[in-house]
Amino acid sequence: YFARTLDVPLEEAVARTKAALAEEGFGVLTEIDVAQTLKAKIGADFRPYRILGACNPTLAHEALKLEDKVGTMLPCNVVVQDAGGGRTEVAAIDPVASMQAIENPQLRTQAARVGAKLQAVMQRLVIA
């Protein structure tokens, strides 16, 4: 995975992450508030933790044409979580690592393109 720790509160990190994703062509299809969900479903307390389901439609379409089972790994999840002390960690899956389970060389090339975009998202967070 790729990760960055930011010296900002969670809500600001979520907003920055969504903006950086948009700049790289990703839309956020889902947003799961894990702490809220765990509290509602099982009464468990958990630190502030969000999962953003990000998708670049063009790259997803290309990947699906190469391998129809790749949909089991979509969208790309990006985690934004409280790291304590007013800091927030943002982490995204490395698609090259996750796609190793699928034996399709063309898909690995596509995963590298997605990975480069997610790394660019992380870099944008640092300079934001």
Indicate residue ranges for each PLM-predicted region.
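Terminal, regulation- and interaction-focused segments at domain boundaries
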Residues: 1-25, 123
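Short glycine-/small-residue-rich flexible loop motifs, especially phosphate/cofactor-binding loops
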Residues: 18, 35-36, 119
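Well-ordered alpha/beta subsegment
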Residues: 101-128
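Solvent-exposed residues in well-ordered beta-strands and their adjoining turns
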Residues: 7-9, 55, 81, 93
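Compact, glycine-rich, soluble single-domain proteins
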Residues: 27-79
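Beta-strand/loop substructures that line and gate deep hydrophobic ligand-binding cavities in soluble
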Residues: 77-104
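Conserved active-site and cofactor/substrate-binding residues in soluble primary-metabolism enzymes
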Residues: 8, 12, 33, 109, ...
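Short amphipathic alpha-helical/adjacent loop interface patches that line ligand
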Residues: 14, 56, 115-118
